[in-house]
Each structure stands twice: as C-alpha cells, then as structure tokens.
Amino acid sequence: MFTQGSFSSEVTGTTLTNMEVTVYDSISAVPVYGDPALQGSTLPRVIAVYSDDQTVRAAVSAALGKKLPGEEREHKVLDFATADALRQYLGDKRKVDLFILDGEAVPEGGLGLAHSLKDELIDCPPIMVIIQRAQDSWLAKWSGADAVTSHPIDPFTLGSKVAELLQ
C-alpha cells in the first residue's frame, strides 16, 4: 500500500535528504476519515461544518476556537454552505475527523445528509447535528447522528461535546 524511505528533491533549488516520507501507490491508500495510522499525530483534526446559514457556520467556528477544552492538538474548521460542496470535498478523498451538520439547512437538511453520510461512507467519522426543536431529537437518532446540540449555539456545550466525539 505504501513505502517509506529517504527523499531527495531539488524542486526549490535546495536538496532535501534523509527526509522520512510516505508514498502511496494508489488513491485508495490516501488517509481518509480518521485513519488509525494517524492516531497520535500532531496534524490538525479536520472538522467539517455544513449549514446554508453563514451565521451558524460562524457561530460554530467561533465556539470551537483553535483548540478544544483539554486538548493540545489544534483543529481546522472547514465551512460548507451546500451539501454538494461537502460531497465534492469527500469525493476528492480528503480527510475529515468530525461532521457538524445543521438540521435546519435548506434545501438539504443536516439530518438527511447525516443519514446519507452514515450509509455512504465506510468508517464514517462521528456526526453531530444541530437541531432547532427538542422534538426533533428522534430524527437525529434516525439520522445516525452520534451527538446532538441545539440552536442557538452554546460554545461551552458544543466544545465539550466535540472534544468527547474526537476522543
């Protein structure tokens, strides 16, 4: 699947030697969806936030900050305004460690998207959905969501739930 060894390059006019690299021999070997080989890694975790409402995406990003409570490792928040953009990102075999999906998003709601992701992705990362009404918690359960939070975004609740999901 991959090989490790030394690497020399003169791309920038500088020769890099004795650099440890991992070379993947196929697209299927690219680390995706919380690859166990990356456990203990210092790479930032990737949190994908989906909502058609920019204020919701901004509130989630602000609540998460750069690091979660009790975490030394930073994370990277990626905003997606459409489900199609999120699917395209995933179709490019890019890594995601956690999804946060707005159940109130239109035209495709986060609950339906969560259900689709759980069905379509092998080893799907954890999914948190944001709901407007407590009565919608049964829909969140149906969707396969691993956690639920509600509007308006509470930074303390969101941060602690996300930290729990990423452990």
Can you annotate each of these PLM segments?
Residues 79-98:
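Acidic, metal-coordinating helix/loop segments flanking the phosphotransfer/catalytic sites
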Residues 99, 124-135:
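A short, hydrophobic beta-strand element within the central beta-sheet of small alpha/beta folds
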Residues 153-162:
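C-terminal output helix
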